[in-house]
């Protein structure tokens, strides 16, 4: 009995690390008129989406200053990458931060938990985290922000990372059962 209990706990604790970014599958095209709401923007999430001719939009509404990070990945299916860019807009649609994927040197990156290869694109963040190779989040003022994901023809798959802090909510066990091989 104790061995089963111990092994179950071990599997749970090992699997929890796989949720560094809480995965969110976006099955529609979030538009400027109907953007996808980013709840708790400091909590690390990965939004998986597919551009099908239109840019995608994500909105953050925060009543307090918060730590901001955004980065873009593209699935690595061959040696050619499809570049993507990020714009961060204020509530008046002015670009306040931009990560131009057409000018970025995209590098292959292996994601060990999902066991997938990606092209690592541009990021909007602070200094580089030497442990991860990704930028750290930075403090941004309270307000409304829109993240725009796009490229020249608005075609392609992407993973948009928002937030840096790891958090495991009440449905973590459900996610572990769903996502653990």
Predicted regions and their residues:
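C-terminal edge strands of extracellular/lumenal beta-sandwich accessory domains
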Residues: 21-36, 58, 78, 84-94, ...
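Non-catalytic, beta-strand-enriched accessory regions in extracellular/secretory proteins
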Residues: 36-67, 72-76, 83-86
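Mid-chain, structured segments of secreted extracytoplasmic proteins
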Residues: 64-110
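Positively charged n-region of N-terminal signal peptides that target proteins for export
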Residues: 1-6
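N-terminal presequences and immediately downstream first alpha-helices
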Residues: 8, 19-20
